[in-house]
Amino acid sequence: MHVLSIDLGTSNTVAVLSTAGRPPRVVEVDGAATMPSAVFADGAETLLVGREAERRARLDPARFEPNPKRRVDEGSLLLGDAVVPVTEALAAVLRRVAEEAVRQLGGERPDEVRLTHPAQWGAVRRAVLLGAAHRVPALGANLLALPEPVAAAAHFASFPGRSLPPGGTLAVYDLGAGTFDCAVVGATGRGFVVLAEDGLSDLGGLDVDQALAEHLGRQVSTADPARWQRLLRPESTADRRAQRALREDVRAAKEALSRHPQADVPMPEPFPDALVTRGELEALIRPNLLRSVEVLAATVRAAGLEPRTLAGVYLVGGSSRIPLVATLIAERFGVVPTSLDQPETAVALGAHHVPREGVAMRTDEVAPQTHRHTRPFPPPAAPHTALQPAHADPGAHTGPQPSRASAHHGPQPVSGQHGPQLPAHGRPPHHGPQNPAAHPQPP
């Protein structure tokens, strides 16, 4: 039996394939374990994806969308003069992964496909993802969906010495490119149950990039304020190319600071190149990383647990590599968090270890008027099965839906400061804290 699991992330997509009882392995696309989740509109009907989309973006940035998943609520994307449904953009990403999997299977299609999704995604957002998958013939035969933290917990439990026996619990801290998500997952005799989950829709690796770009802008923009304004609001193709190059260099500097105490950042002319230190970056992002750790702590409490009773705190998502993340969690919880293998691949690999009928989402059973984190462990006798066959109508509604909002964690700017800033590509403008009562939980 051929099983393909796909973790379609905000910035990167990871696929894992297992065949004939062999251990699951990452499907390399274009020679890499991760494929950019980017799309480029090449004419009215053709969508390029992955690294080819990134390459073409250098020629015409207006036709490029680096993070289509982040725009799942918008219905459609304007790429140059082409209007592309978000469902079709996601389908293009899934199609490229499926093509590579079929090639590696010698032309055969997977017998089963598992798609992971954020635990807080409701029925409408899941319908967008599943509708995209149904547009890809190679994925439609036996399509299942499961929450990302459940897959992460299964990955944790698959390692020797890291078992999660029935009754055991694990906290999952997932800092991806687009959002921060956390959950407490409990092991049952049949599989796993999500005991509590929460997150921050305004915190992810892209927001860390934004904070660093703002910081650099405050340092160098005085050299030519008019030119810097054109970087913020491009007026020409050359301006858009310069803006994209700056974004890439800022991201590379952020990643380098996870390994080194300082990093050089090439700046477009006429601005001088900049040097940024890990200490500077940590000062910029510490307040918001502290927010994420407090959300995790509140989620553990909502599950009726204490940190000392957990089997561990598991770090997933590429941005969890930032050293300050582990430091703050250790200070708050008194335990050193665990990161196994590449955090980018943990969810896709873990999806293979989840029993087909062994997932429950406790939060789905909470009445709309109640708080999302009130149900205790153990699970009810007949829990809602979240790992389920996907029967989404490919034409399901894909229009806007409410953004996530937590009554105790209102949105805040990532840097905590004001100044020149690059627009966050693909994210609606931030307008500060809002009344949580006016923004229900996502469907």
Predicted regions and their residues:
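Gly/Thr-rich phosphate-binding beta-strand-loop-beta motif of the actin/hexokinase/Hsp70
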Residues: 1-25, 159-195, 250
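Conserved NTP-handling cores and scaffolds of large molecular machines
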Residues: 43, 72-76, 98-101, 105, ...
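Acidic, glycine/GT-rich loop-and beta-edge segments that sit at the periphery of enzyme/chaperone cores
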Residues: 10, 223-229, 346-349, 353-443
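Conserved phosphate-binding/catalytic loops in two-lobed NTP-binding clefts
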Residues: 138-148, 326-352
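Phosphate-binding loop and its immediate beta->loop->alpha context
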Residues: 16-137, 142-147, 210-255, 261-263, ...
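Gly/charged contiguous loops adjacent to phosphate- or pyrophosphate-bearing nucleotide/cofactor binding elements
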Residues: 59, 206-330
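Conserved phosphate-binding catalytic cores of ATP/NTP-utilizing and phosphoryl-transfer enzymes
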Residues: 144-173, 302, 348-360
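Conserved A3 ("GATE") glycine/threonine-rich loop of ANL adenylate-forming enzymes
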Residues: 8-12, 36, 148-153, 178-179, ...
